[in-house]
Amino acid sequence: MLPSQSPAIFTVSRLNQTVRLLLEREMGQVWISGEISNFSQPSSGHWYFTLKDDNAQVRCAMFRNSNRRVTFRPQHGQQVLVRANITLYEPRGDYQIIVESMQPAGEGLLQQKYEQLKAQLTAEGLFEQKHKQALPSPAHCVGVITSKTGAALHDILHVLRRRDPGLPVIIYPTAVQGDDAPGQIVRAIALANARQECDVLIVGRGGGSLEDLWSFNDERVARAIFASQIPIVSAVGHETDVTIADFVADLRAPTPSAAAEIVSRNQQELLRQLQSGQQRLEMAMDYFLASRQRRFTQLFHRLQQQHPQLRLARQQTALERLRQRMRIAVESQLKRAEQRQKRTVQRLDHYNPQPRIHRAQSRIQQLEYRLAENMRGRLSERRERFGNAVTHLEAVSPLATLARGYSVTSVNDGTVLKQTKQVKTGDLLTTRLKDGWVESEVKQIAPVKKTRARKPSPTKPAE
């Protein structure tokens, strides 16, 4: 009989699948160094080879989409460093590795060190954006840490002279390649921070191999860049070259020339902006002056419409119309009187009664006298009313008020000043006098205190 709990029974397929999953899950991606042998490339474009050392060997495959990124042709017996995934080929149960990238052994070791240092500094937070310092805008002085004989310095100076010829540049010469280079770069950064001569630093060099650029993958250089109080722009190699210094720096430039463009101002662009600003300012000033002129013209015409002389001229015109009407009325009455007189004379001539003639003549004389008196009275009354109107107009005229020693004070917007709360110290005031204008500045404001009239004390009645 079978026991109650029998052990798990695997099929061959399940066994190979389980082993493959264990290898891929537990091992993950690893770096392997070894010597290439049995290298082959069939028509599919994939690479098949064996990696071996003195004691063991393992089958490898590198598919076409991965090997197209390799920059050299692998050779039999060549030492390489590969990054690969461990797996199992299930149909045959063969253990193998799938290669993702390949480098010659020398560069491969450097790349491995690069990845290890990058992971370490990432874990410490040296690459985080919150530690990045803002570059000065504009920069008043630029420091350059590079080789004094390299092409990078020439490119940087050429760009700075072209874009911003007046920008001061301080060069901190240092080696950028070799065993002494990291220490010299660190000392140059410390010297620049101690002197505080510039407000931005460019640290970099021209292009080269990974080994040539290795000084900028040094941990000491990375920590010196991170500790710098002066913002640093890294400019190492070409755009495809990425170093540890690029991650730590406050800003990465793809090339030294690009770094010079980043920290400098384009004088031609500044000049164009200034000219554009000047044009906008002139247009705004022209518009402002034109609007002020229109406003002044409107106020001038409005003031002219309300001028006392104009009002007096209107009154004189009205008075002249009244005088004409009065003259016409008098002439009309005189004509009617003459006509009545003629009719009366005709009747007298017809009847010729002498007494009635004498009486009629007396009556006519009386009427003429009364008419003349009436006309003189009405003329005198109209003259008196006209004189009173002229006197009243002169009494209420603002010019007459100014002539008596008074003045009218207004603030900048033309509002007549009536109370001290309308102004504050430093305001400009305009005062109209009889013969001109006075502009003044408020130095002090002193309100007049209101006094209350005392009630008379009650008098004691006389005993």
From Swiss-Prot:
NCBIfam families, alphabetized = xseA
Q: Record keywords: Nuclease included? A: yes
Q: Which family does it belong to?
A: Belongs to the XseA family.
Assembly and binders: Heterooligomer composed of large and small subunits.
Molecular-function GO term, any one: nucleic acid binding
Q: What class of enzyme is it?
A: hydrolase
Localization in the cell? Cytoplasm
User: Keywords on this record?
Assistant: Cytoplasm, Exonuclease, Hydrolase, Nuclease
Reactions this protein catalyses:
Exonucleolytic cleavage in either 5'- to 3'- or 3'- to 5'-direction to yield nucleoside 5'-phosphates
The answer on whether this UniProt entry bears the keyword Nuclease reads yes
One Pfam family matching this protein: Exonuc_VII_L
Q: Name one GO biological process term.
A: DNA catabolic process
Q: What is its EC number?
A: 3.1.11.6
Taxon lineage = Bacteria, Pseudomonadati, Pseudomonadota, Gammaproteobacteria, Enterobacterales
* CDD domains for this protein: ExoVII_LU_OBF
Role noted for this protein: Bidirectionally degrades single-stranded DNA into large acid-insoluble oligonucleotides, which are then degraded further into small acid-soluble oligonucleotides.
What organism is listed for this UniProt entry? Klebsiella pneumoniae (strain 342)
Q: Which domain of life is it from?
A: Bacteria
HAMAP family the UniProt entry points to: Exonuc_7_L
Q: What is its main location?
A: cytoplasm
What is this protein called in UniProt? Exodeoxyribonuclease 7 large subunit
Q: Which GO terms describe its cellular component?
A: cytoplasm; exodeoxyribonuclease VII complex
